[in-house]
From Swiss-Prot:
Other observations noted: In plants, chitin acts as a microbe-associated molecular pattern (MAMP) that is recognized by lysin motif (LysM)-containing plant cell surface-localized pattern recognition receptors (PRRs) that activate a plethora of downstream immune responses.
CDD domains: LysM (cd00118)
Gene source species: Beauveria bassiana (strain ARSEF 2860)
Name used for this protein in its record: Secreted LysM effector Blys7
Protein function: Might have a role in sequestration of chitin oligosaccharides (breakdown products of fungal cell walls that are released during invasion and act as triggers of host immunity) to dampen host defense.
Region called Disordered, residue ranges: 81-112, 183-206
Length: 384
């Protein structure tokens, strides 16, 4: 009887435990050609075993370029009795083990690093920001008062155009030893009356810190506005705006609300002086904008031009066109040239002309040098 029972039991299927593994992937990425399980795991702050558990069908150590692989997810292991258990078994015992890949510790620095992170994130990062869809590098750097150059150094995959920044992954916003910059605030939010600067241009106050000299167009920055908003709305390039308002910084984190920003520069500024060495009375104080220039009358009282260094003339070159009569009329006596930031004595010490047309221009581009025009001969006597 005992033997019969043993034989009957021996004929039953083996009651071996069965395991099922289920992966719920929260974030997957495409493998590049040449990558391996090890390299992808390292990029995303995982060990290879965890990477394999998230990708049970992967044939490590190789991965297939162009295929998607899970790098953030939940691994669930179910252990239970086989479905071929005897009919007398009425209860199935199930054990569920869940492994959720949420963070890892970067070896060597002891900092708990959330995953997923931006590809090639620096290893000494100690502060992280989860990039949401629609975020860009400028938004993030402005939020944390960072220089764009620092952010791109810590998150190199983003690239200079920020096109490589991944949404739904953590970016680095500080590293070990980095000292955050204090965010500057304007000392006053009231608008002061304009003041005349050394170039004679009425300038409203307060202005952005470090605003360039020679500005002739201003904009009162409202709370919440960004450099890109202001530049786009006013038809200037962002690079020019940042050059004229350097304290704003590449991330625009240094832009002050309730203070005036520069939106345009004079081409050049000058004072016409009585003597040929830029001394004596100033007859004209002129700020010339744009590329069309301006005619000024000398009234026989100008022997030199004191030209300011500030301005946007290409290569700093200012063209002086000499005319016989006021209003740049009558005979034309040709061109002279000067540089911004110099004293320029005038042709015939100012005695044989009564007007000058001044503009930005390069000598090699004028009609005389190109042979397409001719000027009138110098008069034998002065016209003054």
């Amino acid at each position: 009887m005992q033997r019969h029972l043993l034989l009957g039991l021996a004929g039953l299927p083996a009651l071996l435990s069965a395991q099922r593994v289920s992966v719920t992937c929260s974030f997957a990425t495409v493998a590049a050609n040449g990558e391996t399980c090890d390299s992808m795991a390292a990029t995303w702050g995982l060990d290879t075993a965890t990477f394999q558990s998230l990708n049970p069908k992967a044939k490590c150590p190789e991965v297939i370029g162009g295929e998607q692989y899970c790098v953030v997810g939940t691994v669930t292991t179910v252990t239970g009795e086989p479905t071929t258990a005897p009919a007398t078994t009425s209860t199935q015992t199930t054990t569920t083990t869940t492994t959720e890949v949420t963070s890892t510790t970067v070896p060597g620095n002891g900092i708990t690093t959330p995953v997923p992170v931006q590809p090639n994130l620096v290893s000494n990062c100690n502060k992280f920001y989860f990039v949401n869809k629609g975020d860009n590098c400028a938004d993030i750097t402005a939020r944390y008062n960072l220089d764009l150059s620092d952010f791109l150094e810590w998150n190199p995959k983003a690239g200079n155009s920020c096109s490589g920044l991944w949404a739904n992954a953590y970016a680095c916003v500080s590293v070990i030893g980095y000292v955050p910059k204090p965010k500057p605030k304007p000392t006053s939010t009231s608008t002061k009356p304009p003041t005349a600067t050394g170039n004679g241009i009425p300038t409203p106050l307060p202005t952005q810190p470090g605003m360039t000299d020679g500005c002739n167009k201003f904009y009162l920055v409202k709370p919440g506005e960004t450099c890109a908003d202001i530049a786009s709305r006013n038809g200037v390039s962002l690079s020019d705006f940042l050059q004229w308002n350097p304290h704003a910084g590449n991330a625009c984190s240094g832009l002050w609300a309730n203070a005036y920003a520069c939106l345009g520069m004079v081409a050049f500024s000058l004072k016409s002086r009585f003597r040929v060495d830029c001394t004596g009375d100033a007859h004209n104080v002129v700020n010339i904008a744009g590329d069309q220039g301006q005619c000024i009358n000398t009234d026989c009282s100008v022997g030199s031009l004191e030209i300011a260094a500030a301005g946007v003339c290409p290569d700093g070159e200012v063209q002086i066109s000499y005319w016989e009569q006021p209003g740049c009329q009558g005979k034309w006596f040709g061109y002279g040239y000067a540089k911004r930031g110099e004293c320029r004595g005038l042709w015939t010490n100012g005695w044989k002309f009564k007007a000058m047309h001044l503009r930005c221009a390069k000598s090699q581009d004028d009609c005389v040098n190109k042979g397409s025009c001719a000027y009138d001969p110098e008069p034998a006597q002065g016209v003054c």
